[in-house]
């Protein structure tokens, strides 16, 4: 009915009754007969990528400029002590990488973080702590129950749009706008 969801966005609808996922956009990294894994791409933590690297004691090969927008994201409620790095394709192979699409990879090993600031680093990336998982067919049921909208993913929204604008932008890609703004108070 839905086909392979890997490499797509799911967007939480107002029907979503779990506050954890309210107004989230999730990038689906793996979808197969064993279930689904994705990461929330619009919920930044208070931790920057630079702070994470410092806490992990990585020695940067050369200085790299980090902006305030490069925050670690809350990828989901599962395995919150593990890093999930979604990044553009590189010529370098990292230890635990999984091809999501022809140009996007998910890596869960620290060697990708260690590459930051070197020639082997991915050009674009998001760093998430934790992920979101579904049992086989569970996500398809949630989509059928109108908890999620399904959308094609794009690199602009995934890597470049500000975190807090990603939900609106993902909805606008589906032609949904205007009604998304939060209601004001008198």
From Swiss-Prot:
Signal peptide: none annotated. InterPro entries: AlgH-like. GO terms for cellular component: cytosol. Gene3D superfamilies: VC0467-like. HAMAP family: UPF0301 (MF_00758). Belongs to the UPF0301 (AlgH) family. This is UPF0301 protein HD_1794. It comes from Haemophilus ducreyi (strain 35000HP / ATCC 700724).
């Amino acid at each position: 009915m839905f086909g392979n969801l890997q490499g797509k966005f799911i967007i939480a609808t107002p029907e979503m009754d779990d506050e954890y996922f309210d107004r989230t956009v999730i990038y689906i990294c793996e979808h197969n007969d064993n279930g689904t894994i994705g990461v929330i791409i619009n919920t930044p933590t208070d931790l920057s990528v630079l702070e994470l690297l410092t806490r992990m004691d990585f020695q940067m090969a050369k200085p790299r400029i980090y902006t305030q927008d490069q925050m670690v994201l809350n990828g989901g409620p599962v395995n919150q002590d593990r890093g999930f790095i979604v990044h553009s394709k590189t010529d370098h192979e990292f230890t635990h990488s999984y091809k999501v699409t022809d140009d996007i990879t998910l890596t869960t090993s620290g060697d990708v973080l260690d590459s930051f600031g070197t020639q082997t680093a991915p050009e674009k990336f998001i760093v998430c702590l934790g992920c979101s998982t579904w049992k086989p067919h569970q996500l398809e049921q949630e989509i059928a129950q109108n908890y999620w909208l399904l959308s094609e993913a794009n690199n602009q929204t995934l890597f470049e749009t500000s975190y807090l604008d990603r939900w609106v932008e993902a909805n606008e890609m589906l032609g949904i706008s205007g009604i998304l703004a939060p209601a004001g108070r008198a």
